């Protein structure tokens, strides 16, 4: 078939198709044909559908040399907006981006829980709170589905760390599993009915999630009545019969490892019944039917979208995600430091000022249409002549990508030439260049991070082949330059024919390329300004390396990454920044992490900022206490200077428009309204998962149980650095007239009972602004039969108000969700009778109202 817009598979048609499928055809439908596509059965009109990563943008089918895409702010940034309408609109944009990439299924959103601050993929998820996560996911999925594309909730469940992620068993109590880790999925399914759910890599209580009948058959499909498709994470299938019988419909990617002949054998040996096979086939066919709404042709060419209205939406999202953590008074005029004055000269300092930290690493990463650095955003707003830059220190973990600074030898275009060979290079101890080998492929590229998982060529069979990277580098100034080569495979880097980096002879295992690569090996070379220096990399794919990795996913041919920059004297650079800051009234210091530090494939070893960063911030604040500190990270970092800083922003990874979003908030074009979706501890040891985060002998104990994030800090009376829900504004708000009304308080079926929480919100300041009203419920401590958190978020709403404007905000919450805990003895939710308290919390520590809620009868319930 050429197009999915002709697919018409109603229930009767699907029954008919199943009856006409051969056994081999049925089996083929249950796995991918390649990295991103499902099998087609042309004789029966069953097309292939295309999937694409990921949660913050539609990358398309190519990690390697891919087509640029729109990049949304990361998951924690979207969670910080507390804006359901905005997230719905971003979902619509994602659907349009999927269609531009010829994709029918989007592999997002990610709704795992940040039980600690170190998770490599923590930036992908919305929040440490399951209600915020679930409601945000429902809005996201609704927006994607509104555009005719199928969203995928991932990863079911407890994929909360990267360390040994395919081997580790998350040991979690049934209560914590239900109240914290499954609840986001439950709420998202209740609110949006997304067409697909992806299972996680890890085990849950000893059994891999992708073959867990308890998770897939009993809870997801049985209790919740979920009717969509269940697909594996990529290479996250571990069995034949167990996975099929548990309810895993689609193994990805292809070619299959556990379906195909192995599944045929399981059928003939009665380990899998044909009835069960037909159930799995039906779900795949229903997924194809759902995907037909997109009207995207099969194997459509990938294209760019990059519309003006999309850029405006992305800028709005970037600005609305920035959290104003502190805004004390200026020593000079007794007014709040922010917003800044665009007419004044602004000094911009720091490692994140002149780089685009727009997304985290791993499957969430993509090649953006464009990026905006904080320095660029500020210069565009104030004028380049009003902005001065000082580096201060570097913040990279791996050296900055070199590709865009290279030029091709043949034409002088930006980038380099990438040649692929089936033959290895001639054995030699010296530089030989490309030699007499004939390349089977030759590409012009600019991105010098080349992950080859989805590279293909007719003359390449298997994962073993070779490649060269060649170009010239003309540095702007003379000096010692540092170069880095990271590989999942083997690699040698030559500069002007001299071996500078050997990442082949002796290799050290690292975390690159989803955990299958090496550490970055570095070397130095003196370069002359204005001279064209020859850069050449000799690369062999992953099978040419003898490195062994445990507990990680293997991605075939591997990849290479080439970085480089001028070597920096950090002490001298900090001193230069301090001298400039002492002479400037308006200073912005941009620090933080990037996709080097936060990525799928590994967890952070600590919460600290990169070396030199804290020294830079402290030194600048000593001479300019009014300096504004901007932190970019997807999850919490330590800020030992936070008490000293007077103005502080948390800016996350803001997508394409990150720099503009930061500048909009700094200069008051956007009034900050975001709130922290995560608790920021003062130090790593303060967080509740501190003693039990990594895998130990194949298991990780969720020892904090239900006391994740703010639930722990409230219970332990431990004040963190910044609490969940914290975020300031340039205006002021006042809450009043809290009212709580319950419908059907005595109904035997608690699903007939609901709460209506209403509160009056007034903008009492001089600027337009948006207020986020958070609704918490406090259980009755005197009558609870089990220990419970002090309070739990149950709903929220965001409202935009002009100065002096007053509006009523109303939030509906089912009574069951508002008052229940998971009763392990009864295997059900229990809403106990007693006197609860409903809190409405706004901006500011004292802006809280409380109202009683009397639950008259105890009731149990299951399902959605």
From Swiss-Prot:
Glycosylation, residue list: 434, 447, 503
Active site: 233
Pfam families: Fn3-like, Glyco_hydro_3, Glyco_hydro_3_C, PA14
Domain PA14: 411-578
EC number: 3.2.1.21
Subcellular location: Secreted
Pathway: Glycan metabolism; cellulose degradation
GO molecular function: beta-glucosidase activity
UniProt catalytic activity: Hydrolysis of terminal, non-reducing beta-D-glucosyl residues with release of beta-D-glucose
EC category: hydrolase
Primary location: secreted
Keywords for this protein: Carbohydrate metabolism, Cellulose degradation, Glycoprotein, Glycosidase, Hydrolase, Polysaccharide degradation, Secreted
GO cellular component: extracellular region
Example GO BP: cellulose catabolic process
UniProt keyword Glycoprotein present: yes
UniProt keyword Acetylation, yes or no: no
PANTHER family: BETA-GLUCOSIDASE (PTHR42715), BETA-GLUCOSIDASE J-RELATED (PTHR42715:SF16)
UniProt function note: Beta-glucosidases are one of a number of cellulolytic enzymes involved in the degradation of cellulosic biomass. Catalyzes the last step releasing glucose from the inhibitory cellobiose.
Family listed: Belongs to the glycosyl hydrolase 3 family.
Designated name of the protein: Probable beta-glucosidase J
């Amino acid at each position: 078939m050429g197009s999915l817009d002709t697919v018409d598979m109603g229930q009767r048609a699907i029954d008919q198709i199943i009856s006409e499928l051969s056994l081999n055809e049925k089996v083929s439908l249950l796995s991918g044909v390649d990295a991103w596509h499902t099998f087609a059965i042309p004789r029966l009109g069953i097309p292939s559908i295309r999937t694409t990563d990921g949660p913050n943008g539609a990358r398309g089918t190519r990690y390697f040399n891919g087509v640029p895409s729109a990049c949304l702010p990361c998951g924690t940034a979207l969670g910080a907006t507390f804006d359901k309408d905005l997230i719905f609109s971003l979902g619509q944009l994602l659907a349009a981006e999927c269609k531009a990439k010829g994709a029918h299924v989007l592999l997002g959103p990610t709704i795992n829980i940040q039980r600690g601050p170190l998770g490599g993929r923590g930036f992908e998820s919305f929040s440490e709170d399951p209600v915020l996560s679930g409601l945000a996911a429902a809005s996201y999925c609704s927006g994607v589905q509104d555009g005719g594309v199928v969203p995928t909730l991932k990863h079911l469940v407890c994929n909360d760390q990267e360390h040994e992620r395919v081997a580790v068993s998350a040991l979690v109590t049934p209560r914590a599993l239900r109240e914290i880790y499954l609840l986001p999925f439950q709420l998202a399914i209740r609110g949006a009915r997304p067409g697909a759910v992806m299972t996680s890599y890890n085990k849950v209580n000893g059994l891999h999630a992708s073959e867990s009948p308890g998770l897939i058959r009993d809870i997801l499909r049985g209790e919740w009545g979920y009717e969509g498709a269940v697909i594996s994470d990529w290479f996250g299938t571990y069995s034949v019969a167990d996975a099929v019988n548990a309810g895993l419909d689609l193994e990805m990617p292809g070619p299959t490892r556990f379906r195909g002949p192995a599944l045929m054998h399981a059928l003939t040996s009665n380990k899998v019944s044909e009835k069960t096979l037909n159930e799995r086939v039906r779900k795949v066919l229903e997924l194809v039917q759902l995907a037909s709404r997109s009207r995207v042709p099969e194997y459509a060419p990938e294209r760019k979208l990059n519309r003006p209205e999309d850029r405006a939406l992305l800028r709005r999202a970037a600005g609305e995600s920035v959290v104003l953590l502190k805004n004390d008074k200026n020593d000079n005029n007794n007014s709040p430091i922010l917003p800044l004055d665009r007419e004044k000269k602004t000094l911009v300092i720091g490692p994140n000022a002149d780089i685009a930290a727009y997304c985290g690493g791993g499957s969430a990463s993509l090649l953006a249409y464009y990026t905006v650095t904080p320095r660029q955003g500020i210069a565009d707003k104030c004028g380049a002549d009003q902005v001065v830059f000082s580096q201060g220190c570097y913040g990279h973990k791996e050296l900055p990508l070199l590709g865009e600074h290279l030029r091709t030898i043949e034409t002088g275009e930006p980038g380099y030439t990438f040649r692929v060979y089936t033959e290895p290079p001639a054995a030699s101890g010296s530089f030989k260049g490309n030699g007499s080998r004939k390349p089977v492929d030759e590409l012009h590229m600019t991105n010098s991070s080349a992950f080859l998982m989805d590279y293909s060529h007719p003359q390449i069979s298997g994962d073993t082949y070779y490649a060269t990277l060649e170009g010239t580098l003309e540095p702007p100034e003379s000096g010692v330059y540092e170069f880095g080569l990271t590989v999942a495979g083997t690699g040698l880097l030559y500069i002007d024919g001299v071996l500078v980096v050997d990442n082949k002879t002796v290799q050290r295992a690292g975390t690159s390329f989803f955990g299958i690569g090496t550490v970055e090996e570095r070397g130095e070379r003196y370069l002359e300004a204005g001279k064209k220096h020859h850069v050449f990399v000799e690369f062999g794919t992953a099978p040419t390396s003898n490195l062994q990795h445990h507990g990680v996913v293997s991605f075939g041919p591997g990849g290479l990454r080439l970085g480089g920059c001028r070597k920096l004297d950090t002490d001298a650079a900090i001193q230069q920044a301090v001298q400039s800051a002492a002479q400037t009234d308006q200073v912005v210091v941009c620090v933080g992490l990037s996709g080097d530090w936060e990525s799928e494939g590994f967890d952070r070893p600590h919460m600290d900022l990169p070396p030199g960063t804290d020294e830079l911030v402290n030194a600048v604040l000593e001479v300019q206490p009014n300096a504004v500190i901007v932190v970019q990270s997807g999850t919490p970092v330590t800020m030992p200077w936070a008490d000293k800083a007077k103005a502080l922003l948390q800016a996350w990874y803001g997508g394409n428009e990150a720099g503009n979003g930061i500048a909009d908030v700094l200069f008051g074009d956007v009034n900050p309204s975001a709130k922290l979706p995560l608790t920021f501890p003062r130090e790593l040891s303060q967080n509740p998962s501190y003693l039990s985060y990594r895998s130990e002998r194949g298991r990780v104990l969720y020892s904090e149980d239900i006391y994740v994030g703010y639930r722990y800090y409230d219970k332990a009376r431990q004040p963190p650095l910044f609490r969940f829900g914290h975020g300031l504004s340039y205006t002021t708000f006042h809450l009043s007239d809290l009212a709580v009304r319950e419908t059907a308080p005595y109904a035997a079926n608690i699903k007939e009972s609901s709460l209506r929480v209403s509160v009056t919100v007034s903008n009492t300041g001089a600027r337009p602004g948006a207020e986020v009203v958070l609704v918490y419920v406090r259980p009755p401590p005197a009558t609870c039969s089990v220990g419970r958190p002090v309070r739990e978020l149950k709903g929220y709403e965001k409202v935009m108000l002009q100065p002096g404007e007053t509006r009523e905000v109303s939030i509906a919450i089912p009574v069951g969700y508002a008052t229940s805990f998971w009763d392990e003895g009864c295997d059900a939710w229990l809403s106990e009778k007693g006197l609860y308290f409903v809190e409405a919390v706004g901006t500011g520590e004292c802006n809280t109202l409380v109202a009683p809620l009397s639950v008259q009868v105890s009731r149990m319930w299951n399902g959605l």
